[in-house]
Amino acid sequence: MERAGPVLREVKVRSHRQSSLMSESVKQADIEDSQVFCKQEPVEDNIESGYETPTKSSRAGLGDKTPNGGDIKPRKKAWSPVYLEGLEGRFREHCEVGLCLDDPTLQQALRLFKESKPLLLANIDSIGTSTVEDTERLWGGCVLYVVKALSCGATVDGDKSESNAVGFTLSQLMRQTKIRHARELDMISICAITECLLELPHFLVKVGPIVKQMYGDEWEKRLQVKEVQANFVHLTALFTYFKRVYQDFFLSPDTFTNIVSRSLSGVRDEHHVSVHMQFGWMLFLALRMHVIQQFSDLVTCTNALMAVMFCEPLSGAWSKSNLGFCFFVFMQVILILHMPPDLRKFSLQDPVRFAKRSSEGVDLVASLCATYYAADEDVSSLLEKANATISKLFGKPMKGGLAYLEGLMDKKSLAANLRMLEKDYEDSYQSRGGLDERMFINGEDGLLGTLSNESPRFSGSKVLFLVPSLHVDECKVKSSFPLTNVPVYQRKFDIMASPVRFGAFSMGAAPSSPAASPWSSPVKHMGTQGSSGGKRPPSTPVTITMTTAKWLRTVITPLAAEPSVELQLFFRSCDRDISADVKNRAHVLLDLIFSAERGGGWQGVAGLMDVWPEQRKLEAIKLYYKVLGAMCRSEEQRLHTHNLTSLLSNERFHRCMIACSAELVLATHKTVTMGFPAVLEPAGITAFDLSKVIEYFVRHEETLPRELKRHLNTIEERILESMAWEKGSSMYNSLIVARPSLANEINRLCLLADPMPALENLATQVRPATVMHRIPGLSKSGHSGEVACAAHTPTSASSPPQNGSSTSEAGFLSPVKDRPSAFSAFSSPMRNRLRAPLQSAFASPQRPSPLGGGETCADTVINVFFQKALVLAAVRIRTVCERIGQPQHLIERVYKVFQHALHHETSLFFNRHIDQLVLCTIYGVCKKPSYSVSGFRSYRHSCDMAMRMTLWINFQKTGGLESGDIIKFYNDVFVHVTKKFLVQVDTNSSMRSPRKAHGSDGNDGTISKLLKDEMEVIIIKGEAPGSPVASIFSTFPDISPKKVSALHNVFVSPLRSSKVDKLMSPRTRTLYACVGESTRDYQSPSKDLTAINNRLNKRFIAHGDLAGWTLKTDPQ
């Protein structure tokens, strides 16, 4: 009788559901897929479906035109009263029938859904991209996900939940939340799991206060949304690479049969996998769970995306790169040993694929380790444990080392062994929940999509960096209003990476399919990966991260964990010996940083828990000493002194260097929970502090792989666009000195950063729980309310600088341009200008600048920061305006207004995102002369960036903060502040007729100057309002061959990826060294250009090793 209650309840609910279905049977024929965009025709309410449908049968899609040639405006989703009344009933039915929730969990879900329903109705147009039914399911799925994650043993309103686990898994929830995407014209099918995971951060921004009231302050840490997103993306890349490697090594016994059957039937089955591939994937999952069972409840990616995926999305994240590589290599060894000979594509006698040999024959482990950049000793250490696990799973003895288990994959026992693996995984999965990794091998990867073009909501950088540089091969997002959320360098240099010719990778992008793999001939290519400087195929997500891991293992790991003799000499040459202070600071801060990782999700871990953080700490400290030594040598040459007390005695400088080193190590190992900005709080610094050392770090570490340089680029972009403008940024401490007129506004909003905590106090102030990712858009103090704080007054101040920036600060410009930072090493006339001392970036804001001219160090720092912000804004303004079809002269006006706002209305940027001001500026300039800006009509439906535009808008000039729509911000704040200058820009004839790009008209005056190639430095000079302005945006230079003058050096612009793709096939690209790609491992491309220039100019004999050739020229 105990079980009768739930059964009767389910029967009753099902009976009610059947009656509901009968009453709704008539409406099914009338329900049509909704079009987000439709013609402005008379409409009638469809009561059952809940949204308006045109009376005519014709439908208009995105980009269609009205009969008079105008753009079609987006329709708003409308809820009929009848449909609105049934929201809660349908949600209850879904919970009771579809998921069979118990009563406590059901009540929590109903409460969250009911209290958040007003938010659903208020934001209906920005949720999802399809019908109101899909929007309802999507919102309900997010509600259930939160309840699933937070109700297990949680305290709700003071009452302890009796249930230890919610009775459904994450994959079951995603399957129940079926999203039907109605944009058939675009042939896009959005899967539920992708749509739900992408909507979840925006959902949490809206319902965060409600969730906090129900589950307490720690709800964000327990949800770990970024970890779940990254886990799903990495699982997709993991299986894709596994499938490609499998097909490269082995045949499928039923491949021909299936091809013929599919051809005859006309059915397209792109997700067919053989039973042997299924066995290999399941064996991989089983070995992951059992061999490294201590970490079975943690999720993250590994360094090569081929490492172990710890699949519990709610309990933290961790990565173990070397162990993961070795684990995959070991799995490959097992498949090679046990795969039937008639299914093998390879021969053990192949000297290219199996290059490592001994006196006894082929060294299989060493050959695969060379291919996958794994360490032989690590693989050997795993053999014993893995063999014991396989023996236990199948009940057969298996000796240590390379051993053959009879009957493991033969035809008679394969099916039975596969069922054993399935049962083992099912038992584990039901106990931990999470994503079901079997969905890929079972053919459900087609349902989930490949994350490339499946959803207009998807953006690689969102899951990147979701895992930001996850930034991040670029997926071409289909969006009604494509903004520049993807870092600018990725759009142009997606095929370049160092040291091998690997392209940029966004974890959000779909890996290339096996059919399109350039490794179609494994005999030619497989063995070349292990050699240095060889011709390699284009990159994949795995090969990029493996290259980065190899750099860390081969370049950094062999270094000593102590300062070099030369660096110690610099320490002793200071006013006092600071060697002990430097060592102690490094150990304390790195302990704090990596203890935060350990505290984030290593509870209950034994044995291996201390190995990983200690290894990462050693790598970080070695990298720190290496780069610090290079900086000291550079400063010594510049200052002609060995005494660098002002720099080496600066506490903030050392903390930034240590944090940057730790960030690069964590980025190499792809630790999701410790993604940026997690390193800042343990180090006691702000994001603005870290931005001061990024360019110097890249400049002085010549071996830094391209992918890590891009990672630093992405970090700097994030700092420039939003993080430096947030409350508590140290940028305001310099700004209040450089711009005293802003002191009142800065103090009113309490924007100043707190003093940097002392080293001895950091250990007690930093709590691991606070290091976890926070959902963007939420603050500890909430969205609104008066904020009270004491006014901060600087001890001294200088007069504000003139409009613009000092041209002598070019040296501070970092690689935040439409190109990767590897090109920053190129020599150019602009880089020969005076460079500001490094010490001024970390000196006291009130201290006079070493550059003189009456400036303070605060002036220097702010001028450099504004230069970088203008460069970033210029790229985004041009990108947006070109995509919405605006003319060149209007783009220059937009930039002029933005420049004016930054220098003269700086308070507009406080606590806001720079893209908010970019959008408002573009709209304001286009609105005055009545230019068409139809792209903004659908900004609500682009979701990714547009959603962020609606957050953190300060509407009240007095009082607290308020979040709202960007249109309200534009009308209530932006227009009132910039109206006078907007009118001036439109009426001023000199501004309305911009000069030529290079100032050929001969007009005098200070202008903003941009070199022809975007890889050059951009110097933004100050200019008075109303002065003539040069063309800010130059076109791409002609890349056709030209005669080279022997009087000048050669400066080469990068070949755009689109032209590379047209001119060269993947195989042909391996025969050339493209511009920006070094011919030697971890070597700057500038060294190759030096050898080329020396040869062309014949100035002296150059013995430069260029791709194995020695250039020898006679002196002129």
Swiss-Prot record:
Q: Which UniProt keywords apply?
A: Cell cycle, Nucleus, Repressor, Transcription, Transcription regulation
The Swiss-Prot or TrEMBL record annotates one GO molecular function as: RNA polymerase II transcription regulatory region sequence-specific DNA binding
Location of the protein in the cell: Nucleus
One GO biological process this protein is involved in is:
regulation of transcription by RNA polymerase II
Residue numbers spanned by region Domain B: 860-980
Q: Which PANTHER family match?
A: RE32990P-RELATED (PTHR13742:SF17), RETINOBLASTOMA-ASSOCIATED PROTEIN RB -RELATED (PTHR13742)
Where does this protein have compositionally biased stretches of type Basic and acidic residues? Answer: 1-13
Q: What is the name listed in the Swiss-Prot or TrEMBL entry for this protein?
A: Retinoblastoma-related protein
Chain residue ranges for the region called Disordered: 1-27, 42-74, 513-542, 791-812
UniProt keyword Transcription present: yes
Organism of provenance: Physcomitrium patens (Spreading-leaved earth moss)
